[in-house]
C-alpha cells in the first residue's frame, strides 16, 4: 500500500476505533443492561474489548500497516529512516487525530447523552507519569512481540490485547489508562480542552517521551542480543 493509502486507512481506522469503544459500552450497559457498578458487566465489557482489539489487529494486517494510535506511528517512524519519521510525525499522526475528532463529533451528534471521554483524577505530573509508564511498557511489549513472534497473528494479538487491557485497568482510575493521544484529543476537542496544560502534558508529552524512551531502550538492550543469536546461524549456513 502506498503512502496515500496509508493516510486514508489511518483516517478510517481512527474514526472506527473511537466508535468501537462507544459501541462496546452501549452494547454492555444499554442493550445487555449491565450496571456500571456490576463486576460481571465489567467482565463482559473486557471480553468485547478484546474482541474489538482482535478485529482492529486484523484490519491493520489486512490494510498492510494502517494505524489508529499516534504512539504506534511514532514508534514506527523513529525505528525507520528519516523519511519515515517525517511522514509519521507530520502526516500520519495529524490524520489520526483528525479521524478521532470527526468520530467524536459524529458520536455526540448521534448520541448526545454519551459521556465526555477520559478524565484526569490525579495531579498533572502524576497523570503524565502514569500515562508515560503505561505507554513505555505497551510500546516495549509491542516491539518485542513483533520481533519474537512475527508470524503468529493469534498469539501476538492475544498477548498484546491482554497487556493493553491490563494496563488500561491499572490506569483507568487515574487517567483513564488511554495510551492513545488521538482518542483523548477527540474528546478533549469536543469539550474545548484540547490546548490545556493538563491535556498536553498528560496525554501527549508523557506518552510521546515514553514512546521515544521505549524505542531507544529496545534498540540498545535487545538488538545486540539478536545480533549475537544471528552469528551462530550465519556460521552454520
From Swiss-Prot:
| Cited InterPro entries | Aquaporin-like, MIP, SIP2-1-like
Q: What is known of its domains?
A: Aquaporins contain two tandem repeats each containing three membrane-spanning domains and a pore-forming loop with the signature motif Asn-Pro-Ala/Leu (NPA).
Name of this protein: Probable aquaporin SIP2-1
Q: Report the main location listed first in the record.
A: endoplasmic reticulum
- Free-text function comment from the UniProt entry: Water channel required to facilitate the transport of water across cell membrane. Inactive in yeast cells.
Q: Where found in the cell?
A: Endoplasmic reticulum membrane
Q: What transmembrane ranges does the database entry give?
A: 15-35, 39-59, 71-91, 122-142, 169-189, 202-222
Q: Which organism is it from?
A: Arabidopsis thaliana
Query: Motif location (NPA 2)?
Result: 180-182
Q: Name one GO cellular component term.
A: endoplasmic reticulum membrane
- The question of whether Repeat is a record keyword is answered with yes
Q: Which GO terms describe its molecular function?
A: channel activity
One matching Pfam family is: MIP
* Domain of life assignment: Eukaryota
Q: Which family does it belong to?
A: Belongs to the MIP/aquaporin (TC 1.A.8) family. SIP (TC 1.A.8.10) subfamily.
User: Motif NPA 1: residue span?
Assistant: 69-71
Q: What is this entry's stated membrane topology? A: Multi-pass membrane protein
Question: Which gene specifies this protein's sequence?
Answer: SIP2-1
